[in-house]
């Protein structure tokens, strides 16, 4: 990553790295680009709270950069009402809640590993290793479509993503978010019942 940023710096190219899902990674320190912002003023790392803190309507995010020139330009072009007071206050509270961060991270990491392991041993499905809060799964059983799996999940009051509209995927795929252990077990039961 640093080599790319360095080459972009030589060419006067500003780089933005989206780390919206970084909180879900096993070792944040190994993959974050934030330390590079101290060495390169052509870099900004952006993060949001909507994914990890389950607050999609909040629309709260932040960026880290050492570029005073970029910050000045950003402030000049920024919509004066880009963040309302409720969003600012809530975002501040969320980012200060160390217990939520620690507990949620532990739950996601353990449940993601457990779900991946269980699906890996379930004939008819091929899960793909993930660093996010969701797992992509290919359906291997002939005649079983992603829509069939979606419908079965909905009937059991579980929401998954039918990936048939993903142009880059050929074949039958579903994607699901990591949930609490009970709901994950319910999803495993639904998936197992279809093969």
Model-identified regions with their sequence ranges:
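Active-site pre-lysine segment of PLP-dependent enzymes
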Residues: 1-15, 19-53
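Residue-level recognition of strand-loop junctions within catalytic nucleotide-signaling folds
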Residues: 66, 96, 140, 179-181
